[in-house]
Amino acid sequence: MRSDHPTLLTAIRPTTFIESAKLRDHLGLDITIATETFQHTGSFKFRAAYNLALNVEQDEVLTASSGNFGQALAYACKLTGKKCTVVMPSTSARVKIDAVRGYGATVDLVDTTKVGRNERVDRKSVV
């Protein structure tokens, strides 16, 4: 692990917990909901992505994603100074593609009717 970057615990935002009176009344159970919508990139996936970017030895990271993990990894790589390529289906939502690019990653769009995302990642990883 590189010591010049924040640890996972200092990089993530705290999880917000919400008690649901409505569910308690309906189900007769105390229900607490953990929400990760305030996490970087709006998803719990930033936790895994940052941990990966922080601990992988390579300077470039390659993944397949339809959006959320790709965004999280792109942002994590930006924070850790690594290059990131995200293989995404060409049918991915434009907002997801733009978000991945906005975090500085290269987006490789693939027609998944002709080749799978993981197959494309495998091909790119041997180059």
What is each of the regions a protein language model found here?
Residues M1-V127:
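PLP-dependent amino-acid enzyme catalytic core
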